[in-house]
Amino acid sequence: MKKNVSLQLIIEGALMASEEPLTLQGIANLFEEDKPSKNEIKRVIEDLNKKYANNAFEVVLVASGYRIQVKSGYDKWLSKINKQSS
């Protein structure tokens, strides 16, 4: 269990820190030893999305990998951010 908690924190941190989406292989490559399998990483991503169920963001799979992004229901408010900074 402790390994899964640590794995979750590492993957979550990597997704938040990365400027680009991360592939399953890219996430696995973060680990020098005890590399998680692609299925383990997918399970962690599912767990993160359960954890984020009541938050404004989620982990999504896009063409180039996984990333954390704001859920689509917040577009109305978030679109104002770019207008204000222009």
Locate the predicted segments by residue:
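Short capping segments at the starts of secondary-structure elements
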Residues: A14-T23, P36
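A short acidic, leucine-rich amphipathic alpha-helix
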Residues: L24-L30
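Short, Lys/Arg-enriched anionic-surface-contact patches
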Residues: M1-K3, S86
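Amphipathic alpha-helical interaction segments
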Residues: L9-G13, R43, L61
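Short, amphipathic alpha-helical interaction segments positioned at domain boundaries
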Residues: Y74-S86
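Positively charged, polyanion-binding regions of nucleic-acid-associated proteins
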Residues: N4-S18
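Charged low-complexity interaction tracts in eukaryotic proteins
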Residues: K3-S6, F31, E46-K76
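Short amphipathic alpha-helical interaction segments
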Residues: P36-I45
